């Protein structure tokens, strides 16, 4: 099977790192549980441009260099890689491609999984691409994803989704093309 895997908050615990950075820099006490949507400006009480600037500052910080894998992700990816063709499809902007490659080489050193950047969380002037378009181009049969907008986009385009459960996607209800998973063990057993 051809499987796409999201990076942030599916493979990489980016929200944990982002909140450590944000709480330290802005003297806040946010937890992952507070983030029930991806409207960071509303949660952080700032403008959308300010929220994007804060995220970009985080991308450039040492916190970004110290991100940990999501629990069970490394073992799960190795397990899936033995039986399936894997592709990382991420909303990350291309300007952090080098940091992304370094992280993948550190945590998944013996795997050569291609990475596709869709630039979805980037300034308007950068070319963005829908994850569903990347998945269709790659003939992806299943994507593991946490972002509601990407989940909806993929389901609308008839791509099966394993919804990695996070506070910002709890309102989504399973459908024929959408199944909620809570752990990487759930992911592997659902695919096997």
Where are these regions (language model features)?
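Substrate-recognition element of Asp-dependent hydrolases with the DxDx(T/V) motif
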Residues: 65, 73-103, 116-118
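C-terminal cap/substrate-recognition subdomain and adjoining C-terminal extension
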Residues: 82, 97-192
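Conserved Rossmann-like nucleotide-cofactor binding loop
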Residues: 10, 94, 149
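Active-site neighborhood of HAD-like aspartate-dependent phosphohydrolases
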Residues: 1-51
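Metal-dependent phosphoesterase signature
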Residues: 30, 40-78
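Short, flexible active-site-adjacent loop segments at beta-strand->alpha-helix junctions, enriched
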Residues: 15-16, 92, 165-167
């Amino acid at each position: 099977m051809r499987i796409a895997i999201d990076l942030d908050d599916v493979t990489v615990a980016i929200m944990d790192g982002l909140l450590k950075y944000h709480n330290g820099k802005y003297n806040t006490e946010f937890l992952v549980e507070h983030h029930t949507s991806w409207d960071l400006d509303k949660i952080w009480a700032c403008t959308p441009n300010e929220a994007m600037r804060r995220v970009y500052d985080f991308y450039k910080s040492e916190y970004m260099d110290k991100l940990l894998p999501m629990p069970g992700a490394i073992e799960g990816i190795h397990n899936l890689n033995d039986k399936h063709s894997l592709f990382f499809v991420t909303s990350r902007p291309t300007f952090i491609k080098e940091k992304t490659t370094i992280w993948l080489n550190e945590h998944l050193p013996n795997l050569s999984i291609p990475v596709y950047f869709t630039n979805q969380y980037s300034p308007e002037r950068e070319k963005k691409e829908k994850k569903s378009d990347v998945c269709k181009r790659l003939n992806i049969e299943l994507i593991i994803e946490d972002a509601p907008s990407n989940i909806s986009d993929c389901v609308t385009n008839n791509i099966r989704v394993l919804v990695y459960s996070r506070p910002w996607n709890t309102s989504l209800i399973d459908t024929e093309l959408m199944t909620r998973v809570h752990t990487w063990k759930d992911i592997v057993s659902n695919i096997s």
